[in-house]
Amino acid sequence: MPIYNFSAGPAVLPQPVIAQIQAALPSFRNSGMSILEISHRSDLFEQVINDAEQDLRDLMAIPDNYRVLFFQGGGTLQFTAAPLNLATNHHHIGLLDSGHWAQRAGDEAQRVDTKVTVLGSSAATHYDRLPTIEQPLDPTLDYVHLTTNNTIEGTMTTDLPATGDIPLIADMSSNFLGESYRVSDFGLIFAGAQKNLGPAGLTLVIVREDLIGHAQQLPSMLDYQLFADKHSMFNTPPVFAIYAAGLVLKWLKQQGGLAAMTARNHAKAALLYDFLDQSQLFTNPVKASDRSTMNVPFVTGNAELDAAVIAGASQHGLLNLKGHRSVGGMRASLYNAMPLTGVQALVDYLAAFEAQHH
């Protein structure tokens, strides 16, 4: 029986990548050393990290005036790093409140004495749609914070808000490399790797050069300029996580690149949404135009029935469908490495469940 992992993160990895990792565990590139033990100062790893950066630049068409930084600490650390590095003029940022992770970003910014102005919120409708900017932008805003994909609520931004000369920064953790964006539309992009890029332990930061280097007396581990100057080698980077991410990037190139993967992701999501929309048992609460292609929440409206759906799914090799604890129900995460056959298997199971229980 095939196994399909619908976890929101850490998430499914491409099978060819897992096979390459297995081969590198005993001896990486015939060095006699495992990938888990090579030095971050070695020529072997220098090639790994340089290749990973170049492949990322190729896939996303990253302009030359942007730096690519390899951080640790997850996207959550960037909720602190971003205001410390970029909110240096007025210590004031704007935030689009699209749900849990946007709120977390605002909370962390306030912890470092940054004023947070909520520019729009969809809280009144339980985050079933994306917020819009509801007021003129204050010229004292150092930047506007956007969560491009809301993993819990199941919404995703494709049409970016107009912010004029105010930099737009994006937490892309859950649709990084799963949806096409133009890097030059952003001052900063950050993303935890554990959705579409690799195992947990690595965070990618892509930042425009002119925005960094203005903060003073930053903690070293949060300093974008320092990491840029040291080529992400200020301290020991997450060697294995960067290696695994590099393999995923090469796999993504082999799949046709970002445009091809975006199209595949839209097709996978459409298959599931089309079923949910015609279902008499399952519903998706999200406004159709704002639906995520990465994370699809759905419910029966009955907690006991939801639990039965999840338990039965596990018996059919459909794993990790339980929704986030804050919303309940089910959630299917359809990241890049989830094949169309996995989504079809889920739809077939849900249809059979509905026929039996409705």
Please place each PLM-identified region on the residue numbering.
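Conserved PLP-binding catalytic core of the aspartate aminotransferase-like
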Residues: F282-A313
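Active-site phosphate-binding strand-loop segment of PLP-dependent enzymes
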Residues: A109, S121-F176
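Active-site C-terminal subdomain of aminotransferase-like
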Residues: A193-Y273, K287, Q356-H358
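Conserved N-terminal alpha-helix of the aminotransferase class I/II PLP-enzyme fold
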Residues: G32-Q78, N85, H100, E108
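A glycine-/small-polar-enriched, mobile loop at the entrance of the PLP active site in fold-type I
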Residues: P2-E53
